[in-house]
């Protein structure tokens, strides 16, 4: 069994945050990420700290957040131990990079990515550890070409790790990013995985490296293709309406958000994924035969790519 090196994981995550921020700034051409470094004082429920980076009012990106955090605690919150009683009584560390990018142009999809590592330790016992993460795409005016290239990149990332990895993690993504009260997916999916520890540590670590580094490879070509398409008030209004679904999912269903808030995490960083503007409209129905209707009919349900 390969040795568990949580320090190497932390170094990778911090360098990944740097790399993603640099690539997004280059694509935007104007805005830069502003860093808010934070740490927890001794005696708080959670120790540790992180680097929250936010970009606002760019040429391409209306708002984006790329967050690194490394927190530790003496015991798990009840929300976690209810599902995993073996974690009770163990000190834990959780570290990861999480990001959400909200573009200006409605023809450029919103995107999200996350890679994370968790370890719970108790003296005299083997550590309990796992990796999680993935990336997913939320278009407002989808292009078949973009959705296909997004999933083709995901397939290429997964291929070296096993012939079933893409299919499993793609299906998991479709299931996870689903809004039951709306009976629709949040977007066109991608990859999602959690509790990844059935391979050797080194192989699991290599996989999250590939996913983390693959995010920009998948997303930035789509941004480049769509960022200069002309749009008007109608497209902007629909973009804001669909952003409301993002808010609904994150506040009602997202496990990371719920875990962070319940465990005493840093609220500003946890809610960094929220769009700067969103809107709701009572009983909205897209007009038949419109691009807005096509989103509902063809893209907000699981499909094979």
Swiss-Prot record:
The record marks 181 as: Important for dimerization. It is found in: Cytoplasm. GO terms for cellular component: cytoplasm. Its EC number is 1.3.3.3. It catalyses: coproporphyrinogen III + O2 + 2 H(+) = protoporphyrinogen IX + 2 CO2 + 2 H2O. InterPro entries: Coprogen_oxidase_aer, Coprogen_oxidase_aer_sf, Coprogen_oxidase_CS. Its cofactor is a divalent metal cation. Keywords: Cytoplasm, Heme biosynthesis, Metal-binding, Oxidoreductase, Porphyrin biosynthesis. A divalent metal cation binds at residues 102, 112, 151, 181. Substrate binds at residues 98, 114-116, 264-266. Disulfide bonds: none annotated. Involved in the heme biosynthesis. Catalyzes the aerobic oxidative decarboxylation of propionate groups of rings A and B of coproporphyrinogen-III to yield the vinyl groups in protoporphyrinogen-IX. Belongs to the aerobic coproporphyrinogen-III oxidase family. This is Oxygen-dependent coproporphyrinogen-III oxidase. It comes from Vibrio parahaemolyticus serotype O3:K6 (strain RIMD 2210633). The lineage of its organism: Bacteria, Pseudomonadati, Pseudomonadota, Gammaproteobacteria, Vibrionales. The gene is hemF.
């Amino acid at each position: 069994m390969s040795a568990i090196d949580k320090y190497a994981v932390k170094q990778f995550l911090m360098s990944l945050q740097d790399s993603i921020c640099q690539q997004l700034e280059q694509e935007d051409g104007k805005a830069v990420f502003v860093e808010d470094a934070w740490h927890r004082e001794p005696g708080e429920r959670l120790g540790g700290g992180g680097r929250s980076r936010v970009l606002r009012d760019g040429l391409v990106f209306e708002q984006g957040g790329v967050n690194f955090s490394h927190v530790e605690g003496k015991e798990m919150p009840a929300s976690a131990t209810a599902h995993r009683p073996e974690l009770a009584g163990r000190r834990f560390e959780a570290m990861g990079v999480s990001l959400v990018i909200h573009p200006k142009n409605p023809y450029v999809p919103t995107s999200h990515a996350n890679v994370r590592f968790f370890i719970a330790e108790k003296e005299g016992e083997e550590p309990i550890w796992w990796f999680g993460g993935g990336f997913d795409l939320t278009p407002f005016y989808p292009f078949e070409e973009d959705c296909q290239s997004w999933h083709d990149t995901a397939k290429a990332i997964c291929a070296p790790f096993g012939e079933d990895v893409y299919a499993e993690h793609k299906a998991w993504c479709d299931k996870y990013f689903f809004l039951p009260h709306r009976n629709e997916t949040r977007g066109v999916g991608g990859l999602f995985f959690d509790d990844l520890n059935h391979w050797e540590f080194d192989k699991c670590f290599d996989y999250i490296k590939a996913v983390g580094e693959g995010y920009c490879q998948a997303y930035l070509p789509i941004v480049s293709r769509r960022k200069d398409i002309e749009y008007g008030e109608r497209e902007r209004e629909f973009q804001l309406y669909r952003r409301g679904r993002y808010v609904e999912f994150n506040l009602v269903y997202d496990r990371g958000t719920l875990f962070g808030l319940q465990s005493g995490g840093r609220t500003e960083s946890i809610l960094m994924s929220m769009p700067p503007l969103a809107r709701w409209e009572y009983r909205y129905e897209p007009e038949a035969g419109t691009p807005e209707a096509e989103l509902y009919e063809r893209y907000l349900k699981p499909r094979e790519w």
